[in-house]
Amino acid sequence: MTWSYPVDPYWMVALKALLVVVGLLTAFAFMTLIERRLLARFQVRMGPNRVGPFGLLQPLADAIKSIFKEDIVVAQADRFLFVLAPLISVVFALLAFGLIPFGPPGSFFGYQPWVINLDLGILYLFAVSELAVYGIFLSGWASGSKYSLLGSLRSSASLISYELGLGLALLAPVLLVGSLNLNDIVNWQKEHGWLFLYAFPAFLVYLIASMAEAARTPFDLPEAEQELVGGYHTEYSSIKWALFQMAEYIHFITASALIPTLFLGGWTMPVLEVPYLWMFLKLAFFLFFFIWIRATWFRLRYDQLLRFGWGFLFPLALLWFLVTALVVALDLPRTYLLYLSALSFLVLLGAVLYTPKPARKGGGA
């Protein structure tokens, strides 16, 4: 099933693109404060609360500090690529957010609550997310530092391990809906129920792979401070370092918006027609969830991430893709997927709860 959507004039598209860029940059600034305050609460501390009322001006202080720090370009660096790398990371991080619908058609002052609406939206998102890694790779290559190069190589190698699972997880909603358009996916969920219920394994794989793609704990291996002295941005300082942080947080925010859009109904809700509020609450929940994981989880080793990507994420995503494809190809009732999805949840829960812990070395109790 396909739906038709109105098209905005070019000036409105440009205005909405500007609003998205300004909004994401503002969100990045305040997410640094929110994350630090939440991490502090998890660790029974106060967090930054000195600059301005309740510490609300801390992002401004951080921005001023970054701008006025000395901007160093090391002698052995490739200057052009060294400067280009953080710009690539930020630009491709910004490009994905414009496709996300935040409400029904015509709900943004008579215009559409998205920047652009592409029939190949999922393919576009996948391509943009893959291109963003070039910024990380070029930063390590151009820095002339072995730590930076190792960080960028880690990012490139781990990308292959989790992106295959992520891509297959995206195909589950595409097969069910029969469209690559994000608005079609949201409208299908409005009529048939959240895709999370039909494809729990795909949801789980996409959630985990999104954390890896945003380089969030426990998958922040490219910048592991204890092992790589900061990783791919070891040699960066001042505003260039801030641009890498900006790209990471924008990926973080975009992932938190895409997960509910693809699997949790987007702006729709069975009760109370307040689409912008529901979308904001779902986005805020996943922002909090990712910060919670960072506060309570440990960083995986490099080999553990590769083993996890190839040994768990990819097989699980492939299995569910084949199951979904079989149900769709044979035109079986979609309730079969509901039962299989619930069964997969119980199996995975049982595996987590009843997996025996490895014996301690040395035979200690």
Swiss-Prot record:
Report keywords, A-Z. Cell inner membrane, Cell membrane, Membrane, NAD, Quinone, Translocase, Transmembrane, Transmembrane helix, Ubiquinone
Which residue spans traverse the membrane? 11-31, 80-100, 120-140, 157-177, 192-212, 252-272, 273-293, 310-330, 336-356
Q: Name one Pfam family in it.
A: NADHdh
The reaction(s) catalysed by this protein are: a quinone + NADH + 5 H(+)(in) = a quinol + NAD(+) + 4 H(+)(out)
Q: Which GO terms describe its biological process?
A: aerobic respiration
Q: Which GO terms describe its molecular function?
A: NADH dehydrogenase activity; oxidoreductase activity, acting on NAD(P)H, quinone or similar compound as acceptor; quinone binding
Q: What is its EC number?
A: 7.1.1.-
Q: Sorted alphabetically, which PROSITE patterns does this protein's record hold?
A: COMPLEX1_ND1_1 (PS00667), COMPLEX1_ND1_2 (PS00668)
EC category? translocase
Membrane topology term reads:
Multi-pass membrane protein
Give the location in the cell.
Cell inner membrane
What broad class describes the main subcellular location of this protein? membrane
Q: Which InterPro entries match?
A: NADH_UbQ_OxRdtase_su1/FPO, NADH_UbQ_OxRdtase_su1_CS
- One cellular component (GO) term of this entry: plasma membrane
Explain the purpose of this protein.
Answer: NDH-1 shuttles electrons from NADH, via FMN and iron-sulfur (Fe-S) centers, to quinones in the respiratory chain. The immediate electron acceptor for the enzyme in this species is believed to be ubiquinone. Couples the redox reaction to proton translocation (for every two electrons transferred, four hydrogen ions are translocated across the cytoplasmic membrane), and thus conserves the redox energy in a proton gradient. This subunit may bind ubiquinone.
Q: Which family does it belong to?
A: Belongs to the complex I subunit 1 family.
Q: How does it assemble?
A: NDH-1 is composed of 14 different subunits. Subunits NuoA, H, J, K, L, M, N constitute the membrane sector of the complex.
Kindly provide the name given to this protein in its UniProt entry.
NADH-quinone oxidoreductase subunit H
According to the entry, what is the taxonomic lineage of the organism?
Answer: Bacteria, Thermotogati, Deinococcota, Deinococci, Thermales
